[in-house]
Amino acid sequence: MQGSVTEFLKPRLVDIEQISSTHAKVILEPLERGFGHTLGNALRRILLSSMPGCAVTEVEIDGVLHEYSSKEGVQEDILEVLLNLKGLAVKVQNKDDVFLTLNKSGIGPVVAADITHDGDVEIVNPEHVICHLTDESASINMRIRVQRGRGYVPASARVHAQDEERPIGRLLVDACYSPVDRIAYNVEAARVEQRTDLDKLVIELETNGTIDPEEAIRRAATILAEQLDAFVDLRDVRQPEVKEEKPEFDPILLRPVDDLELTVRSANCLKAETIHYIGDLVQRTEVELLKTPNLGKKSLTEIKDVLASRGLSLGMRLENWPPASIAED
């Protein structure tokens, strides 16, 4: 085995041992020393906590007001019935939220196959027992809500303020969305030519049947790769700050000269010179204003004082005046 001392080995052999339709063992080798635990632990955590799936989240049972009760003619108490419903393995196509119904009467077990659903729903474990009816006249009617999600979400985490209006008798169920029932990994020694310090990763997992074990590992590896992509190219991906554009002119310059509340004489003199905005006025000099008919030193002093009270003065230079909004007017 030739290669640079800095070159990492890549797994060349992937062996998949299909024990059953829901149980498989995947062997990956060779791996550099330590990479067996690095990859095995990462994949295990993703498979257990981050795989999407469907689970029962709410149940309504006729005649039942809360989970701490029992129902006449049903062998199990309501808590046990809810626990059994959590064991349903459901596949839903094209929807994230569906409602199923179950209506059964007469002595005998109530199983998942008794649930009524449409073509978008598939119950993978139809023989799964939900409860037992113990009397010929006994019956059970329930409405089951199934939602798509990820990981494990307890009922308490889904209680919101608006849920105070939830009808009495609608029971929340802890939702285990992950389709993976069990996952374990083991790291064994591997050898390639003269190297004996390599790892062999053995992953064994069982699913609830809604996903193939091989596909589950493939999805987990994809999730891990997508998360690590950010480290491959460490660029600053933060959104650039949007700088607020400052107005080209002080808003006071865009106001009409009438807002200065000058005397009638001074105001009329300015209008006669087509000075309509404060921005027009501040660009005039004292000499120019004194040339205005009927505008004397008293009016000039008044104008200067009013402008000074607003932080302005005569003889100011304004680039690009007038602005488009005024020019259009």
From Swiss-Prot:
GO terms for molecular function: DNA binding; DNA-directed RNA polymerase activity; protein dimerization activity. Its EC number is 2.7.7.6. Residues 1-235 are annotated as: Alpha N-terminal domain (alpha-NTD). It catalyses: RNA(n) + a ribonucleoside 5'-triphosphate = RNA(n+1) + diphosphate. GO terms for biological process: DNA-templated transcription. The keyword Nucleotidyltransferase applies. Residues 249-329 are annotated as: Alpha C-terminal domain (alpha-CTD). SUPFAM superfamilies: C-terminal domain of RNA polymerase alpha subunit, Insert subdomain of RNA polymerase alpha subunit, RBP11-like subunits of RNA polymerase. InterPro entries: DNA-dir_RNA_pol_insert, DNA-dir_RNA_pol_RpoA/D/Rpb3, DNA-dir_RpoA, RBP11-like, RNAP_asu_C, RNApol_insert_sf. NCBIfam families: PRK05182.1-2 (NF003513), PRK05182.2-5 (NF003519), rpoA (TIGR02027). DNA-dependent RNA polymerase catalyzes the transcription of DNA into RNA using the four ribonucleoside triphosphates as substrates. Belongs to the RNA polymerase alpha chain family. Homodimer. The RNAP catalytic core consists of 2 alpha, 1 beta, 1 beta' and 1 omega subunit. When a sigma factor is associated with the core the holoenzyme is formed, which can initiate transcription. The N-terminal domain is essential for RNAP assembly and basal transcription, whereas the C-terminal domain is involved in interaction with transcriptional regulators and with upstream promoter elements. This is DNA-directed RNA polymerase subunit alpha.
